[in-house]
Amino acid sequence: LGISRVVLPRESTIEEIRSLSGQGMEIEVFVHGALCVCYSGQCLMSASLMGRSGNRGECAQPCRMRYELYREEMQGANKIPAQGAYLLSPKDLFTLHELDALLDAGVSSLKIEGRMKKPEYVAQVVSMYRAAIDAWKQKRQLPQDAQKEWDLRKLFNRGFTKGHAFHASGRAMMNPIRPNQQGVVLGGVIAVSDRRITIRLSEDLHQGDGIRILGKEEDAGCIVNRLYKDGKLVAHAKKGEVVAIDRKIPARRHAEVRRTSDSELQQQLRRTYADCRKVKVSVHLTLQVGKGLVCRMRDEEGFCVER
């Protein structure tokens, strides 16, 4: 058929990947990011319920919504108690530590899910996988950088899973507790007044960071615009210190506080791509019946590519 590359579905196992890589075609696999709860290309839930087709890049993510579980019986439907309400929400795929197995299996291209993600997230994820690829090419041990993985969690994660490729299933794949950014543990609430929330920190905190205070029913989040230490405004506070923030969100004593964005980390990552040269291009697409799609791109200096 003249096929040069095949993009495998996310439910492919490492054994299937290894088998298919010997068929004379390049193999592309999904290695990181958001997972679909359904078989690839077969989820019609978003299109049916909300008129937005997941197969056309418009998924409204109904799998990230709250659900209840029922068992149908002769007497009617009985609700089944479940841990959490987000029963269809998968964790995020994370295969950095298994990347050597994928590359050894013959994978030619790695796909990272970046839909609706910030450039800082893309910079961090791509740099980590790039370093791992380079180590594999040079026959070195894959990097085990705990700090970078911690930073990645601060940027975005729903919990991590190795995915179907490495036979994860059930609780190893799903996160029914929360469908959004989990962040990392920042500390705990030790006091709540009419005006302020007092927190004991287990990590450093900076003005401009995003936090979430976990609740029994719902969580509440905000940006730390003002940070107080010993009654005085400060720009940052260190692990182990007691600080206060303005009470803009609900909070209760002993509630866990999580950091959902790190302003210092984001600034560091922006610097890694701030000087990247951007080139304006014009794109011309040609589609004719019976012929393939032709894409022609030309930059301001007249250089042109076509495929």
Where are these regions (language model features)?
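Surface-exposed amphipathic alpha-helical tracts and adjacent flexible/coil segments at the periphery
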Residues: 3-307
